[in-house]
Each structure stands twice: as C-alpha cells, then as structure tokens.
Design a protein with these regions (language model features):
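Non-catalytic terminal extensions that flank enzyme cores
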Residues: 1-45
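M16 family metallopeptidases and their MPP-like homologs
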Residues: 43-53, 79-127, 134-140, 167-192, ...
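In a subset of proteins, long, contiguous C-terminal domains/tails are tracked
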Residues: 874-918
Length: 918
C-alpha cells in the first residue's frame, strides 16, 4: 500500500460513489487531517476546512473568512482573492462560513492554476496579514465613518441578510433549539452585535481556531497526489506543531416544547403574513443511515403538495404554504416545518395540526410505493449530484463535516450501502417507526407576526496596492483551444425533430415545444401552468399517484419555460416550453409513457384542479416576496433589460415584477374556473402547433429504443409544425424604484449593446479594477459588478448596498477612469485569461446537455465559438481603452431600476420616474 512521507495512513478504500479511491491521512507534525479522493475527474479540487464555533453574535468567523483573503505574508497585496478572480481558470473559487466550520474550496481544470491557487489559499489561511493590519478588520468587519455611522463589508452584508422575515425566524429557532451551544448564535454576525467585536478578540479567535490540527484538507481529482502532499508538508504543515488542545463543540440538552413569539418589523404589516416554525432533533450525526432515512421520509411525506403530510396540513387552510427544512451536517441534525402566509391565530394551531396529521398517517401506515419512489429519486440525485458546484468542492465540504463530528473525513462520501440497507428495511415498517420517533417530542415552536417598525432609539505590516505575484502565472497559452461539441445527429421522426447527442452515464430526454407566435399577454399564465402541472390529476392517475410513479422511475422530471437570443440573422428570440427527464437508460420506455400521460392527459377543470391553481399561485407569490429581499439585483436587471431585449421582456413576464403583479391579480379575482379554461386553451394550442423537438442525450442503444417508442406515443404527429421566433413590442424606458424591507439596496443600470464577446474583457476590468474598490471596499456593498448578456444588454449592479444615489454617481465615473489608465501586457494577459477561462468552465452532464441544446437552437457552431474566442484573446490595451471611452455614452442611455429601502429611495427620488412599494 502506498505511503506518503510525513503522513500516517489511517485507511484506504475503494469508493464507487466517487469513481475512485479514498485515502485518509494524518500529518505527523501538525496533526492535520487529509482526505485524498483519487479519480479521473479533470476538474481538480482543493478544500481546507476549520472547526469554527461562535460564542456570540459578532460574526467573528464570517469576518475572518473575509479577512484572511485580504493579503498574506507571501502575497502582501490588498486583494489577492480579487486578483485570482480576475486571472484564474477556476471553475469554483470561494470561501464559506457555516454554523460550525469555515471552508475554503476551489476547483480548476488547469494544473498550473491548481498549484497557484493552493499556495494562495494556504498562505491566506495560515499567514494572513490581517493579524497585524487592523485596517483589514475595519474594512471587512466594521468601522465608524466620519458621521458616526457603522459600516463594513460583513456588517452591510448581514444587514441585508438578516432583514428578511425568514432569516429572523431561522435565527430565533436556532436560539431556541440550541440556547447553550455554538448553534444558537448567528455565525454570519448580527449587525446589532458586530460592533461589539474588538480587534484584539478577533486576533485571539483566529489564533485559537486556525491551527493545522483543527483543519481538514481535501485533494480531489486526477492529479499527482504525492507531489501535492509533499508541497503541503514542506511549505506549511511541517512548520506547525500541534496545539495544546483543539476547540470542541458541546452537545445541547434537547429542548422540548419551547415556545416563543417574535415580531417582524415591516412598513406594510399584513394580517396574513405571519409564520410559524416547528423544529425537532433527528438523532446523531454519526448515524448516517438514520439521517438518510429522515431525508427520504421527508421527501415522501412533504415533497409535493399532494404528499400525505403536506396535503393533510394544507387541507387545514392554516396558511398558504408549508416548507420543510432538514440539516444533517451539524453535530445535532434537525428538521423543521414552516407555515407561511398565516394569521397569528392560525399560526398558533399549526403544532396541533401537525400532530393530528402525523397520527393519521401512522394509523394507516406510509404506502410502501411512496417510500420506494422517494428512495429511488434520492439515490439518483446522490449519484448524479445535480447543480453547478463541482463534485470535488462538495466532497471537500462533506469531508470537513465528517471529520469535524466523527474524525472520519470519508464518512459522508459512502452512500451505496446505506441505500441498500434502507431498501431492505422499507418493507419492515422501519420508516413508520422513524416517523413515530421523530415527531413524538413536543416541537420547539416560534411564531412570527408582522408589526410596524418601532421608532429608533437614541446609540501594522503594510499591504500594497500592487499586483499578485504568483510562482507560475497563467498565460493565454494555458487556455487551450476550448471544448468542441460532440457531433450529434438530427432527423425527422413521427412529426418531431429528433436530436441525438451521444453521451455515457445517465440518460437525459428533453422535449422542446415551440412558443413562437404565442401572445405576450398569455405567457405569464403559461409560466404558472408549468408550476401547476405537477399538482393536476390526469385521466389515469391522481397527481400524487403520478408523482410517485415519476419518482420511482425517473431521477428527475419537470416542465419549465426558457428563451434565448439566437445568433441567426435578426437575432431572433427562441422561446420554448421544456419538459425534461433524467433517468437510467433502462427506464427510457417508462419515461416516454409517463411523459405522454402527464402532458396529454392532464385535467384542468374541477375542484381538484382549481384548488391546485389557487395553492400554487399563493405559494409562488410568497416565494417571490422572499426573493425580492434576497435577490433584488436580479429582478432589477431583468426589469430594466426588458425595455431593450425581447428575451428579457419575456423573462420579466414570467419571472419578474410583472409576473408578481399577475399573481396578485389572480389571487384578488379568485376566478379559478376561468383560469382553468384559459390554461387548457393555452396548453392545447402549444401542443397543436406540433413544433416539437425531442433531444436525447444518451447512448446509441437509447436512441434505438427511442426511435421505436416515438411513432406510437402521444408525441407523434403527421407532420411537424413550423417553429417561429417569439416577438413582442418593447416598452419605452422607465426608471423605477421598488421599495422593499431590509435597509439595503440593489442598484442596477442597464443599457443596450450589440453582443460582442470581447466586451467580457471590459466587464472584468470594470468589475474588478474599478467597482470592487469603489463600491465594495470604499462603499461597503457586499457585491458589485458589470455583466454582459447574450441578449444585447449590459448592466452594472450593486448587491446589499448601503448606498443608492452615491452608487449611481460611482457608476458614472467608471468609464472615464478606465479609459485614462495605462494597461501593461501583463495586465491584459490577466484580463484575457480570466475572461476566456469562463468559456471553458467544466459542466456536469445535465448542464452540458442543456448547453448543447441551447447552442443548437441559437445556431451557435464550433467555428463561431472559435472565432469569438480568438477575437477575445486578441484584445489589446488600445482596444480596451477605446471600449471604456465609448461606455459612458452608452450608459447615459441606460435605465435605472432599484430594489431598496424607503429612506434611500426617497432621498434619491429625482432619479426615478416611478416608485412602487412591493
């Protein structure tokens, strides 16, 4: 068995879930835990996680997370992390604070980049200049401005983060569940407490927790592990002897039946916006079978509106929606149920309703087919690992959790045996007993009631502005030629356009129904329909029965709308209603069968359908109100871009403020019979167009199977209809402000600009050379940047910004400042590498499938991509300065949209043509 000098082998084992082997090591001198995940994934990853346990609400570990990335002994520049963002090929580059740990992970497909990033990260966490430079603490944590107001990046971020009713409810619940341990504190920091943190305590906390024997290091992917381990040993770990004792978490005595009422202060308190959260403990972290069983059980009982427990609770009509939360990453995992859209009176009845519903389910027993469906879909998701976060980053986070709570970094990476065991227990009544045990204790209960706001009460080693000097800086030569599309096939079969993209692994089937020619005023209704579809009965099954079958046979399935601006002449907008299904290849026939029933046999009328429409509309309205507070910049950008782009105009109708207005109008009219008729009419018109494209991402054998299935399926037609561009008349530009609760602002400026890939270089320079310093470091906003979009729009934005008018003034000065700067060849190389590398970010199979289909509809060829890439890589300083000089005039034609506080909007009301309170 292979040995590594300087390390003691703990264990080495095969891991089919990771397609390779796991090796757990302990570093001899420092005591650091190390996990090696060796497989053939080219998207290599690194992560280092520390056990960080807050003892107050000052957010010290969140501030440290920001601070250590602000300069180190080897890299003594103010923002090495920022400079990495500008020039790295990383597919993931971040740091994150959890309630009990802080993790610093990255992923990159480039070997040289990996070495650079690993050294910068290690030097940052072990040798930060923040320990001798109080200015970092003041910038990232908190300080007082000349007028006495408190500011700071984390302080401002948390003002926005904790402004939402959900965040306040969650924090109150954590305090009630864990009154005596670290989990009861706000790890991100409460703005009311952050100014109590002194620099001296901040330094002490760092020295206590950022030690090598209090960390877990993960190396993942296809790489020379011996080389990386030797670097770790020689450059860092061998210089760090073990500390006297590691900090440890304490176990909370379980709180049973604790109750508390809390207010949520808002300018528009509504009687039906109360919430109630109930929480229970789910057992030991180390009992992974039990925790996986809880996940499966919650999916079966609460995963959809028709699931037994959720359906029973919704029938009580105590509120508009019920959410379920489950966190099995902490020392004492918990589950919670949250009733939303309730009155104060109905919120008080929620706990009794849950008890009654659980007892009813236990009396009948949980249907085995329902449990099997949830087990299957959960297992598929655990193997597929959907989403954009690289697998290696997920492994690094999971390794830190496993090491922290059990000493075994590999614990969470093994799941096959757990699923096999639970399959055996499914028929033994194990899940019924688990349900009984989970809900037996009285829950911790928090009721939140909206209330009008109260009246305010009357209370170093130098870092340079220089460039980051890496041992092996990347150049344009490191970029390679870019990934080419795998050749596929296209044919007309059974009245449908059939695309095949050869791929291994899971099978992905996408059905694209063309929406060109649809009336713009109908698109909001059609979008709502895609959400309602999961809730409707068919001619053969109830909605719950069909959902159970879909979960049994498919990894995932759903319907949604999307649109893209094509590269064809005239830049048409291609709008599609998409039905997507993922599965094991052997389930392809079942996918066609279930998809046919779901799409062609749905019932839109009757009490069941009308109740589903009302329920989903209410739930979607609540969800949007929550998102306005968290993602205001995205809604603002969509709203403003709708004046310049058909793609954005359609997106705004289906996902923006216009869609929110549509939902409010529906709920006010409450004519669900009429809505059902409208939905059925729209659905039939989409299907009758017969402009269907079927895209299969899978093996040749899967293609042969699909060719046999399509002609006899409901998708078949005599001939294929014509696909058309989606069009609508754009509205005249309007500067708008939308008032939200929260005390922070999301400021956006959007302008039209013909799409050119070279503009991505300018966007990176604007984002990281100008906005980062002036908006984030000086202005105190949590985020900012410039974005170029494929639909022919560009925009500047701020995120959780304490300022409004000042930020627009800063925006306006940017073009001239960038045009006046001098850029060296090294500068241009960094900008180009950073911009071009994003074109090659590794994608997971599901993402790759969606991207391939999008390119097909938009007419994007490998030749186009190569030409654009060449153009981007040839941008020189003169071209960049010319683009910057031209930007000012374009920005003057832009539209301002803000989601912000009442005070900030009123102070800058001359900037807006229209103001609305959401």
């Amino acid at each position: 068995m292979k040995q590594y000098p300087g390390y003691t082998l703990v264990k080495r084992e095969d891991c089919p879930e990771q397609h390779g082997t796991l090796t757990v090591l302990t570093h001899d001198v420092s005591g650091a835990a190390v996990l090696l995940v060796e497989n053939n994934d080219d998207n290599k990853a690194f992560g280092i996680g520390f056990g960080t346990f807050p003892s107050d609400d000052t957010g010290v570990f969140h501030i440290l997370e920001h601070s250590v990335l602000a300069g180190s002994e080897k890299y003594p520049v103010k923002s090495p992390f920022l400079q990495l963002l500008k020039s790295s090929m990383a597919s993931f580059l971040n740091a994150m604070t959890f309630p009990d740990k802080t993790v610093y992970p990255f992923a990159t497909p480039n070997e040289t980049d990996f070495k650079n990033l690993m050294d910068v990260y290690l030097n940052a966490v072990f040798c930060p200049l923040a320990m001798v430079d109080k200015g970092v603490f003041e910038q990232e944590g908190w300080h007082r401005d000349e007028d006495g107001t408190v500011s700071g990046v984390v302080y401002n971020e948390m003002q926005g983060a904790l402004a939402t009713p959900d965040a306040q409810l969650q924090n109150a619940l954590s305090r009630a569940m864990f009154p005596d341990t670290a989990y009861g504190f706000v790890s991100g920091g409460d703005p009311a407490s952050i100014p109590a943190l002194t620099y001296e305590k901040y330094v002490r906390v760092y020295r206590r927790h950022y030690s090598a024997d209090n960390c877990c290091i993960t190396l993942y992917g296809k790489m020379d592990m011996a080389e990386k381990l030797a670097f770790l040993d020689e450059q860092y770990l061998s210089r760090m002897p073990k500390s006297a004792s590691r900090p440890r978490l304490t176990v909370q005595d379980e709180q049973v039946g604790a109750k508390r009422n809390i207010p949520y202060y808002t300018e528009k308190p509504e009687p039906d916006e109360a919430q109630c959260a109930l929480a229970w403990y789910t057992g030991a972290f180390s009992d992974r079978e039990r925790q996986l069983g809880v996940e499966i059980l919650l999916d079966a009982l609460l995963g959809t509106n028709q699931a037994p427990l959720k359906a029973a609770l919704l029938e009580e009509k105590l509120g508009a929606d019920i959410d379920v939360g489950f966190d099995d990453s902490t020392l004492q995992p918990t589950l919670e149920l949250v009733l939303r859209g309730a009155t104060e009176e109905s919120a008080g009845k929620f706990a009794a309703a849950v008890r009654k519903a659980v007892d009813g389910i236990l009396e009948k027993g949980i249907p085995e087919e329902l449990l099997m469906a949830s087990l299957n879909s959960t297992e598929f998701a655990s193997l597929e690992r959907p989403g954009s976060i690289p697998d290696g980053v997920l492994d690094a986070i999971n390794a830190s959790a496993g090491w922290l709570h059990t000493g075994d970094p590999a614990l969470l990476l093994h799941t096959n045996a757990l699923f096999a065991s639970l399959r055996e227990k499914l028929e033994q009544g194990w899940f019924n007993e688990l349900l009984r045990e989970l809900f037996a204790p009285a829950p911790v209960e928090i009721i939140q009631v909206p209330t009008l706001p109260r009246k305010e009460e009357e209370g170093r080693a130098a870092r340079t502005d220089g460039k980051l000097v890496l041992d092996h800086p990347l150049t344009a030569a490191d970029l390679g030629e870019g990934k080419k599309q795998t050749p596929g096939s296209k044919e007309l079969l059974a009245g449908a356009e059939l695309l095949h993209h050869p791929s291994a692994g899971n099978t992905y089937l996408y059905l694209y129904y063309d929406l060109g020619g649809m009336a713009p005023e109908d698109m909001s209704c059609l979008h709502l329909l895609t959400d309602v579809m999961d809730e409707l009965d068919t001619e053969k099954h109830t909605a719950q029965e069909l959902n159970t079958l879909r979960n049994t046979w498919l990894g995932s399935s759903g319907a949604w709308m999307d649109c893209w601006t094509g590269r064809q002449e005239g830049r048409p907008c291609h709008a599609k209603l998409i039905v997507g299904m993922s599965m094991l290849e052997r389930s392809l026939e079942k996918a066609v069968e279930l998809g046919s029933e779901w799409l062609y046999e749905t019932k839109f009328s009757g009490p069941q359908a009308e109740a589903a429409m009302e329920r989903v509309a209410s739930q979607q309205k609540l969800l949007m109100e929550q998102k306005f507070l968290r993602e205001g910049h995205a809604f603002a950008a969509m709203r403003a871009a709708a004046h310049f782009s058909v793609e954005s105009a359609l997106s705004e109708r289906c996902n923006g403020v216009s869609y929110y207005h549509y939902l409010c109008e529906l709920l006010e009219k409450a004519d669900w019979t009429a809505l059902g008729k409208k939905m059925e009419e729209l659905w039939k018109s989409v299907l009758k167009k017969n402009a269907l494209t079927v895209s299969l991402h899978g093996s040749d054998a899967a293609l042969d199977t699909l060719k046999k299935l399509l002609p006899g399926s409901a998708f078949a037609a005599e001939k294929r209809g014509e696909a058309k561009p989606y069009t609508e008349e754009l509205t005249a530009p309007v500067n708008e402000a939308f008032i939200i609760d929260g005390g922070v602002n999301y400021d956006v400026l959007v302008w039209p600009m013909e799409r050119r890939l070279e503009r991505k270089v300018l966007a990176r320079v604007m984002s990281y050379e100008y906005l980062w310093h002036n908006i984030r470091e000086v202005g105190g906003a949590y985020g900012t940047g410039m974005v170029t979009q494929n639909d022919g729009t560009e925009y500047l934005y701020t995120y959780r910004d304490p300022h409004l008018k000042e930020s627009y003034e800063t925006f306006a000065k940017g073009p001239a400042e960038l045009a006046d700067r001098d850029y060296t060849g090294k500068d241009m190389n960094e900008f180009i590498v950073g911009a071009a590398a994003k074109l090659d970010t590794p994608r997971k199979p599901r993402e790759e499938a969606a991207s391939t289909d999008c390119k097909y509809f938009c007419g994007i060829t490998d030749e186009m991509t190569a030409a654009e890439r060449k153009s981007l890589c040839s941008v020189d300083a003169a071209a960049l300065k010319a683009e910057a000089a031209d930007l000012s005039a374009r920005m003057e034609k832009g539209v301002r949209v803000v989601f912000g506080s009442k005070e900030a909007v009123e102070a800058a009301k001359e900037l807006f043509d229209r103001v609305e309170t959401l």
